[in-house]
A protein has these predicted regions:
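Single conserved hydrophobic/aromatic residue that forms the stacking wall/gate
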Residues: 1-6, 10
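Short, compositionally biased leader-like segments
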Residues: 167-202
Length: 418
């Protein structure tokens, strides 16, 4: 118990130290009261970058592993500076991960909950009236996402996803095989072709860029059992409506465009008052925000009027349901026994649709925080297989699978063949 408590305190102190450095540039136990210094967000990666430059000056051919990055803005720092940078996430089933932390590191269930909250980008606050009390979520400050750990977001933007089964503590063969695969491709791009899982998920990744959602872009692909693509979708408004990214508070208050803004938005007194106040808040920022389109999320604004968290008010279709509807809309074939690929993971509503359609495999990147898996999918006698994505995606997909030169020409060149 003492070892577990010491480990927990150790992690908290290091997490607080990181938050302090990102907020004010140094370690201060009263950092939460300090004024946020935006340039401090990159203090840690700048320090790491200086170490990298020293190592490169000593040895020109240098391979660097940074263990580990848990802030998405630190990822952005290295991506903008190194073309050969790959963000690698190592994932394990949540059940196996928790079992490993409990058995090996002696975490209690409360400590696991604390860890998940602190690493998820959600602000937490410890109740000091109880010893080892779990952290409780509280309202985030405007700067909080810049200074805190957000493992969930880092997984979402990772370039390469590895799977590390934790059910056999000393068996690392699966992880070693994946490391050998991707390190070989980093050193020699194009040695082999992508897996079917990578190929389809890359399509979903590309599709998500069509989304006009202000909060998050998600892509989805439906295939048959052989990974032959039948439909793609992304989260966006229904065809014929204007996406949220192209609408604005200025527009809803002044244009009264019937195609762009709904009857409710043009006429509801309480909604328009809330929209007016938000617009004034933006305009009062002056030159700092000059030139921006003051887009707004209808769901967020409507919920702020109702003092509610209703998810039904979203304007957009989810990526998964959009893909399902494409098949129905254009007269596609049945997909029973097929696969659903999604760059996130299905919510409760989309999970029910996938189950009803007879989807056999759901391949996902980022686990959904709700109860879609435990309540909707893991029940009945036709449960789909849940598969966490393994492979390269996005920019790294092209970097490691595109040949620098045709392999035949490379062999001829190295072999001195004319």
């Amino acid at each position: 118990a003492l070892s577990s408590a010491a480990s927990d305190v150790y992690k908290r102190q290091y997490q607080n130290a990181g938050n302090s450095i990102r907020k004010c540039g140094d370690i201060n136990h009263e950092y939460e009261e300090k004024i946020f210094s935006p340039e401090s967000v990159f203090h840690l990666p700048e320090t790491i970058n200086r170490v990298i430059k020293i190592l490169r000056s000593i040895n020109e051919k240098t391979f660097i592993v940074i263990d580990a990055i848990r802030n998405p803005y630190e990822v952005k720092f290295f991506r903008d500076r190194y073309s050969a940078f790959h963000l690698v996430s190592i994932n394990a089933p949540d059940k196996d991960r928790k079992k490993y932390l409990q058995n090996v590191h002696k975490f209690t269930s409360d400590q696991l909950e604390d860890l998940d909250i602190r690493e998820s980008g959600r602000k937490s606050n410890i109740n000091t009236s109880e010893e080892n009390a779990p952290y409780k979520e509280e309202k985030k400050d405007a700067y909080f996402e810049f200074i805190s750990q957000n493992v969930k977001r880092c997984i979402e933007i990772s370039d390469i996803h590895l799977f590390n089964a934790r059910n056999e503590l000393e068996n690392h063969n699966i992880l070693k095989a994946q490391l050998a695969w991707y390190i070989s491709l980093m050193l020699h791009p194009g040695l082999i072709t992508p897996t079917a899982m990578e190929r389809v998920m890359q399509i979903a990744f590309t599709a998500k860029l069509n989304s006009g959602c202000l909060s998050r872009q998600v892509g989805a692909v439906i295939t048959d059992i052989n990974n032959s693509v039948k439909a793609i979708g992304w989260n966006d408004v229904a065809k014929g409506q204007v996406p949220c990214s192209l609408r604005s508070l200025d527009g809803v208050m002044n244009s009264f465009d019937k195609i762009t803004y709904s009857e409710f938005e043009r006429n509801d007194k309480n909604f328009r008052e809330k929209a007016r106040n938000k617009l004034l808040t933006f305009k009062n920022k002056g030159d700092k925000i000059s030139g921006y389109n003051f887009s707004y999320c209808f769901k967020t604004l409507k919920n702020s009027v109702d003092l509610d968290k209703n998810q039904v008010h979203t304007r957009a279709l989810h990526a998964e349901e959009n893909a399902f509807l494409q098949i129905s809309k254009y007269g596609g074939i049945g997909i029973e026994g097929g696969k659903l690929y999604t760059t996130a993971s299905p919510c409760e509503l989309c999970a029910k649709k996938a189950y009803q359609l007879g989807i056999k495999d759901i391949v996902f990147i980022d686990p959904y925080p709700g109860i879609a898996i435990s309540h909707i999918l893991n029940i009945g006698n036709a449960k789909p297989n849940l598969v966490q994505f393994r492979g390269a995606i996005g920019r790294s997909y092209h970097k490691i699978y595109e040949q620098i030169m045709p392999y035949k020409d490379e062999l001829d060149f190295l072999g001195g063949v004319n």
